[in-house]
Protein backbone atom coordinates (compact mmCIF):
# COMPACT_ATOMS: atom_id res chain seq x y z
CA UNK A 1 0.00 0.00 0.00
CA UNK A 2 1.16 3.53 -0.77
CA UNK A 3 2.40 5.75 2.03
CA UNK A 4 0.02 8.41 3.33
CA UNK A 5 0.97 11.90 2.12
CA UNK A 6 0.99 14.51 4.90
CA UNK A 7 1.91 17.54 2.81
CA UNK A 8 3.69 19.16 -0.07
CA UNK A 9 6.37 21.84 0.30
CA UNK A 10 7.33 24.05 -2.64
CA UNK A 11 10.63 25.92 -2.44
CA UNK A 12 13.06 27.68 -4.77
CA UNK A 13 16.63 26.98 -3.68
CA UNK A 14 19.95 27.90 -5.36
CA UNK A 15 21.44 24.74 -6.90
CA UNK A 16 23.92 22.95 -4.65
CA UNK A 17 23.40 25.47 -1.82
CA UNK A 18 20.62 23.99 0.33
CA UNK A 19 21.39 24.57 4.02
CA UNK A 20 19.35 24.07 7.21
CA UNK A 21 19.09 27.88 7.52
CA UNK A 22 15.87 29.66 6.47
CA UNK A 23 13.96 29.20 4.20
CA UNK A 24 14.74 25.46 3.98
CA UNK A 25 15.03 24.56 7.68
CA UNK A 26 11.77 26.02 9.02
CA UNK A 27 9.72 24.78 6.04
CA UNK A 28 10.94 21.19 6.48
CA UNK A 29 11.13 21.29 10.28
CA UNK A 30 7.43 21.97 10.78
CA UNK A 31 6.68 18.76 8.86
CA UNK A 32 9.23 16.75 10.86
CA UNK A 33 11.50 15.98 7.90
CA UNK A 34 15.20 15.18 8.39
CA UNK A 35 16.60 18.51 7.17
CA UNK A 36 20.22 17.39 6.73
CA UNK A 37 19.21 14.35 4.68
CA UNK A 38 17.21 16.59 2.32
CA UNK A 39 20.00 19.19 2.02
CA UNK A 40 22.61 16.53 1.24
CA UNK A 41 20.47 14.77 -1.38
CA UNK A 42 19.34 18.06 -3.01
CA UNK A 43 22.92 19.37 -3.22
CA UNK A 44 24.09 16.10 -4.84
CA UNK A 45 21.29 16.16 -7.41
CA UNK A 46 21.74 19.82 -8.36
CA UNK A 47 25.55 20.15 -8.24
CA UNK A 48 25.74 20.35 -12.05
CA UNK A 49 23.36 23.37 -12.19
CA UNK A 50 25.45 25.66 -9.96
CA UNK A 51 24.39 29.31 -10.06
CA UNK A 52 20.76 28.64 -11.00
CA UNK A 53 17.69 28.75 -8.76
CA UNK A 54 15.97 25.34 -8.80
CA UNK A 55 12.29 24.95 -7.84
CA UNK A 56 11.66 21.78 -5.83
CA UNK A 57 8.43 20.08 -4.71
CA UNK A 58 8.92 17.97 -1.58
CA UNK A 59 6.32 15.32 -0.72
CA UNK A 60 6.19 14.53 3.01
CA UNK A 61 4.74 11.19 4.15
CA UNK A 62 3.12 10.15 7.45
CA UNK A 63 6.23 8.24 8.60
CA UNK A 64 8.26 11.49 8.22
CA UNK A 65 10.03 10.21 5.13
CA UNK A 66 10.08 12.38 2.01
CA UNK A 67 10.63 12.40 -1.71
CA UNK A 68 11.24 15.37 -3.94
CA UNK A 69 11.08 16.40 -7.58
CA UNK A 70 13.31 19.13 -8.99
CA UNK A 71 11.90 21.30 -11.77
CA UNK A 72 13.66 23.38 -14.42
CA UNK A 73 14.85 26.86 -13.35
CA UNK A 74 12.30 29.71 -13.71
CA UNK A 75 12.14 31.29 -17.18
CA UNK A 76 13.12 34.70 -15.78
CA UNK A 77 16.36 33.27 -14.33
CA UNK A 78 17.24 31.64 -17.67
CA UNK A 79 16.46 34.87 -19.57
CA UNK A 80 18.62 36.93 -17.20
CA UNK A 81 21.47 34.45 -17.66
CA UNK A 82 21.12 34.50 -21.47
CA UNK A 83 21.16 38.34 -21.53
CA UNK A 84 23.88 38.56 -18.85
CA UNK A 85 21.87 41.02 -16.72
CA UNK A 86 21.37 41.15 -12.94
CA UNK A 87 17.66 42.00 -12.96
CA UNK A 88 14.83 42.94 -15.27
CA UNK A 89 13.50 46.45 -15.85
CA UNK A 90 11.47 48.18 -13.15
CA UNK A 91 9.40 49.78 -15.94
CA UNK A 92 9.33 47.19 -18.74
CA UNK A 93 7.10 49.21 -21.11
CA UNK A 94 9.33 52.29 -21.04
CA UNK A 95 12.81 51.03 -20.13
CA UNK A 96 14.34 48.20 -22.14
CA UNK A 97 17.34 46.60 -20.43
CA UNK A 98 18.54 44.00 -22.96
CA UNK A 99 17.86 42.09 -26.18
CA UNK A 100 17.43 38.36 -26.71
CA UNK A 101 17.43 36.47 -30.02
CA UNK A 102 14.80 33.99 -31.22
CA UNK A 103 17.44 31.21 -31.06
CA UNK A 104 18.06 31.88 -27.36
CA UNK A 105 14.29 31.93 -26.73
CA UNK A 106 14.07 28.55 -28.54
CA UNK A 107 16.86 27.08 -26.36
CA UNK A 108 15.15 28.26 -23.17
CA UNK A 109 11.77 26.93 -24.39
CA UNK A 110 13.32 23.51 -25.17
CA UNK A 111 14.88 23.41 -21.70
CA UNK A 112 11.61 24.42 -19.98
CA UNK A 113 9.35 22.18 -22.11
CA UNK A 114 8.86 19.40 -19.49
CA UNK A 115 7.49 21.92 -16.96
CA UNK A 116 5.39 24.08 -19.30
CA UNK A 117 1.78 23.29 -20.17
CA UNK A 118 2.42 24.06 -23.84
CA UNK A 119 1.41 21.65 -26.59
CA UNK A 120 4.12 22.69 -29.06
CA UNK A 121 7.55 24.29 -29.05
CA UNK A 122 6.10 27.41 -30.72
CA UNK A 123 3.60 27.84 -27.87
CA UNK A 124 6.41 27.43 -25.34
CA UNK A 125 8.50 29.99 -27.23
CA UNK A 126 5.67 32.53 -27.08
CA UNK A 127 5.38 31.98 -23.30
CA UNK A 128 9.12 32.57 -22.85
CA UNK A 129 8.98 35.63 -25.16
CA UNK A 130 6.11 37.04 -23.06
CA UNK A 131 8.13 36.56 -19.88
CA UNK A 132 11.07 38.34 -21.53
CA UNK A 133 8.87 41.27 -22.60
CA UNK A 134 7.47 41.61 -19.07
CA UNK A 135 11.07 41.93 -17.82
CA UNK A 136 11.91 44.74 -20.27
CA UNK A 137 13.89 42.47 -22.61
CA UNK A 138 13.33 42.97 -26.35
CA UNK A 139 12.86 39.76 -28.39
CA UNK A 140 14.54 40.11 -31.79
CA UNK A 141 13.46 38.16 -34.87
Swiss-Prot record:
Family affiliation: Belongs to the universal ribosomal protein uL11 family.
Post-translational modification, as annotated: One or more lysine residues are methylated.
GO CC term, one of those recorded: cytosolic large ribosomal subunit
GO biological process: translation
Name this protein carries in UniProt: Large ribosomal subunit protein uL11
GO molecular function: large ribosomal subunit rRNA binding; structural constituent of ribosome
Any Pfam family matching the protein: Ribosomal_L11_N
Function: Forms part of the ribosomal stalk which helps the ribosome interact with GTP-bound translation factors.
Keyword Lyase: no
Quaternary organization: Part of the ribosomal stalk of the 50S ribosomal subunit. Interacts with L10 and the large rRNA to form the base of the stalk. L10 forms an elongated spine to which L12 dimers bind in a sequential fashion forming a multimeric L10(L12)X complex.
Domain of life: Bacteria
rRNA-binding keyword on record: yes
Entries under InterPro entries matching the protein: Ribosomal_uL11, Ribosomal_uL11_bac-typ, Ribosomal_uL11_C, Ribosomal_uL11_C_sf, Ribosomal_uL11_N, Ribosomal_uL11_N_sf
Keyword tags: Methylation, Ribonucleoprotein, Ribosomal protein, RNA-binding, rRNA-binding
Amino acid sequence: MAKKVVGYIKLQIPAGKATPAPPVGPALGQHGVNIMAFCKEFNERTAKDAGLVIPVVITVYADRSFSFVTKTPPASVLIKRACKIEKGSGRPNREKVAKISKEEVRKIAEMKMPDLNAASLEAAMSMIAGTARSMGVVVED
